[in-house]
Design a protein with these regions (language model features):
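Hydrophobic faces of well-ordered beta-strands that scaffold small-molecule active sites
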Residues: 16-20, 45-47, 93-97, 122-124, ...
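Glycine-rich phosphate-binding active-site loops on the catalytic face of alpha/beta enzymes
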Residues: 43-53, 119-130, 171-182, 224-244
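Catalytic beta/alpha-barrel core
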Residues: 70-73, 118-132, 146-155, 174
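Active-site-adjacent beta->alpha loops and helix N-cap segments on the catalytic face
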Residues: 1-7, 52-61, 73-83, 102-108, ...
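N-terminal amphipathic alpha-helix/helix-capping segment at the start of soluble metabolic enzymes
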Residues: 1-20, 83-87
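Alpha/beta catalytic cores of nucleotide-metabolism and tRNA/nucleoside-modifying enzymes
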Residues: 78, 195-204, 213-219, 223-258
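Alpha-helix-loop-beta-strand connector modules within alpha/beta enzyme cores
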Residues: 60-94, 138-152, 188-206, 248-258
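Catalytic cores of alpha/beta
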Residues: 27-37, 155-166, 212-228
Length: 258
């Protein structure tokens, strides 16, 4: 069974997934950051593939991607860094990146290398659902790689039902149509959106991302979904701690408690 499906079959609430950008703040820190996060009890990890034009990302992750590219991070290097990761790490690993670098690598080769490396799923924010259905789905399924689709408050119920029917893993609920970034709490409008999707009784579990940074936002997200994805907050802490993932993780977990 794919590790993503395994996670959601054994844990339905308070799942914590952490995002960081490969190659930031240092080129060589990717594998060690993953190992630290698993040791700290994180349930799932999203590893960002840096790209020069990350349209869905706020200033924190854009800055991380720019620096990672300057450091020399590439998709090929990332796979090289992760080639032995499954000797030590058991939790689900998801790659998050834009279509351009993935297509340059070759989608079939990309999915095959994901399987060989032990990557369980991929989030591609700029992959249209129609293209996923027509061109990409069968290739990914062949390699047991889950393609995770995003929905926003603007996504129609019809589209959400289609995504739920034709994907497997989890649905990434973007908390707002805006770019990524931390916020103190979710307003009533966003909470109504979370509840509206919860009431649809979808087949796939849901994870809420964009804007999770503290106890309040994590608890709100977890009340309406299986858990939350934290990106900008952890990337900021990683930068402040000069790549010391242990200190950054401790500070993040502290923020989620108090």
């Amino acid at each position: 069974m794919n590790r993503i499906n395994q996670l959601f079959s054994t844990k339905q609430k308070d799942i914590l997934s952490i995002y960081f950008c490969a190659g930031f703040p240092t080129l060589e820190g990717t594998a060690s950051t993953i190992k630290v996060l698993e040791k700290k009890g994180i349930n799932m990890i999203e590893i960002g593939i840096p790209f020069s034009d990350p349209m869905a990302d706020g200033p924190v992750i854009q800055h991380a991607a720019t620096r990672a590219l300057k450091n020399g991070m590439t998709l090929k290097l990332l796979f090289d860094q992760l080639k032995d990761i499954r000797k030590e790490v058991q939790i689900p690993l998801v790659l998050m990146g834009y279509l351009n670098p993935i297509m340059q690598y070759g989608f079939k080769d990309f999915c095959r290398t994901c399987r060989e490396t032990g990557i369980d799923g991929v989030i591609i924010p700029d992959l249209p659902f129609k293209d996923y259905m027509e061109e990409y789905r069968s290739v990914a399924e062949e390699q047991d790689v889950r393609i995770i689709m995003l929905i926003t408050p603007e996504t129609s119920e019809e589209r959400i039902r289609l995504i739920d029917e034709h994907t497997d893993g989890f649905i990434y609920m973007v908390s707002s149509a805006a770019i990524t970034g931390a916020q103190k709490d979710f307003n009533a409008q966003k909470q109504a959106y979370f509840q509206r999707i919860a009431d649809m009784n979808l087949r796939n579990p849901r994870m809420i991302g964009f804007g999770i940074s503290n106890k309040q936002t994590f608890e709100t997200a977890s009340a309406h979904a299986a858990g939350a994805i934290i990106g900008s907050k952890f990337v900021t802490l990683l930068d402040e701690e000069n790549g010391n993932a242990e200190k950054a993780a401790d500070k993040l977990l502290e923020a989620l408690k108090n």
